[in-house]
Amino acid sequence: MLTIGFVLAACGSSDKDKDNGKDNASGDKEGTEESADFSAAMVTDIGGVDDKSFNQSAWEGLQNWGAEHGLSRGNGFDYAQSNDKADYIPNLTRLVRDDYNLIFGIGFELKEDLTKIAEQYKDTHFAIVDDVIELPNVASITFKEHQGSFLVGVAAAKKTKTNKVGFVGGIDSPLINKFESGFIAGVKSVNPDIDVKVEYAESFGDAAKGKIIASNMYSSGIDIIYHASGGTGNGVFNEAKDIKKSDPDRELWVIGVDRDQHDEGKIGDHNVTFTSMVKRVDVAVEDVINQAMKGEHHGGELLEYGIEEDAISVATTNEEAMTDDIIEAVNEWKEKILNGDVDVPKTREETKAYVEGL
C-alpha cells in the first residue's frame, strides 16, 4: 500500500543560477562528509537532457545538488541518455552496477522497466518522476500539473483575441490529460465561449510533428497554443517564430511547459512565449536527494508537489505580454485553488462535469 509522504526543504526556496546543459557542476564547496559517500543518477526518457523542458529540468536539479556538495558529473552524479525505449533497461542496469545510491527514472514511460529493475535489485533505492510504483524501494514523485495548467488557461483566456486557443500534448495518457484538463477548465472558467482545440503528437521527441500541428492550429485562427509535449514542443515554438518572422504584426503565442521557456520564444525584437507553466522538477529531484542523504528514502511513498509547495507556478518573464490585469486574474484564481474554492479537474470526465457546472 502506497503512503503519502511529506514534501520538505527545497520547495519555496529561491531560484538558483543553473548550468543549463553543461555536463559538469562545479562549486567552491568541498564535498561534505555526508555527500562524499552518497551518489545519485538519473535515466532520461527519449526527450533527453537538452529537451529544454522536463528532462532538462530534472538534470538541472541533479546538477544543483552536485554543485552544492562539490561534486561533478561522473564523480557523485550522472545521467544516462535514452534515445529509444529499448535503452531504459540497459541504462538503469548500468547505473545500478555503478553503485549509485539513488537512481531516478524521469517520466512515466520508464514505469514498466523501472519496476522490473527495482524488483530485481531490491537493495537499491529508486525514484520515479510522474508516475507511481508501489514497491518498498521506489519513491514516487508526482506533480499537480492540472493546477498550473488551469492558471495558464486563465491567462490564455484573458489574452486571446480570436477566442480560439489550442493544446498540443505529447502522448495521450493520464499524465498529459491532467495538463489538458486543467487548461480547458481554466480557459472556460474565464469565458465558456472560447473554443479549445486539442491534438496529440503521440511523441515527446518529434519536433517536426509539433511544427505541423502548430501550423494547422495557427492557420485555423488559433492565436495561443499551450504545449505539454517535451521536445515535440520545440516544433511548436519554431512554427510560431517562423510565422512571426514573416508577419511581425501578427499576434500569436506559445505557452511553455515544465521550465520557463521564455528563451525558446525569442525572434529578433519579439518573443512568442506568452508564459510558461513552470513545473519544478529540479526542486523535487534536489529535495528527494537531500532527504535520501539523511536516510529518508521514502520508498513506497507518494510525494506530491503543487502550488501549495511553490513547485508549480506561472512565469511572468514576458512583462509586455503578461500584463498586470492578467497577472491579477491568475493570482485571484490561484487563491481560489489554495482556499479550496476551486477543485481543478484532472481527467476529461471531471473536466466535462466542471465545464457543465459553470
Segments and roles (model prediction):
Residues 1-3:
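Sec-dependent N-terminal signal peptides
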Residues 12-15:
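Bacterial signal peptide processing site
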Residues 19-358:
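A residue-level marker of the well-folded mature domains of exported/periplasmic proteins
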Residues 7-10:
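C-terminal motif of bacterial Sec signal peptides marking the signal peptidase cleavage site
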